[in-house]
Amino acid sequence: MLDFSTVMTIVMQFALLLSMLSTMNTQATERPAVPDAIKAPAGESVIVNVHASGSQIYVCQASADGKFAWTLKAPDADLSDDQGNVVGHHSAGPAWKYRDGSEVTGKAAARVDAPTPDSIPWLLVSATGHTGEGMFSHITSIQRINTKGGQPPAASTCDTAKLNSESKSSYTADYYFFAPKN
């Protein structure tokens, strides 16, 4: 007969196992077809891919020469798995945080124009930092592809009257996260 403590330990271990398995439902094994300029390094493989839906947030600012322009402040998007479950969030940094608490930040390494002019560019991002242990702990590269929307407002709408105002531009994209092959 098992005592209560042993039963609870088994239950907790089973719950942890189920939690770990549930994070695997977004796992991908194949690299997406992308232009050479934004291909992840050959020694990396896809760990997970997610769909982003949210906004690119722009702010109207004046440059040193007095010209006004909309500049990117931050993305703000939910990350979903292939079943539509929210599994993380994309925010300023840029940063991507997974539901297990792990987070990766990065810096754009390469870009290509999106196939449609009203969409933000496709990117290859190099990881610059990590926090927490989990899905994003060992990510080294991130691709942003299949973008739709997200471009800033027309430049003519940024002027003295709009200085420091924000504008959100809806967008969707697919993000592929890469880590070194085992």
Name these PLM-found stretches.
Residues L2-M12:
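Bacterial N-terminal signal peptides that target proteins for export
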Residues V11-S22:
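Bacterial N-terminal signal peptides
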Residues M24-A28:
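Sec/Tat signal peptide C-region and signal peptidase I cleavage site
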Residues T29-Q56, A64-N182:
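Primary mode marks residue(s) on the alpha4-beta5-alpha5 output face of response regulator receiver
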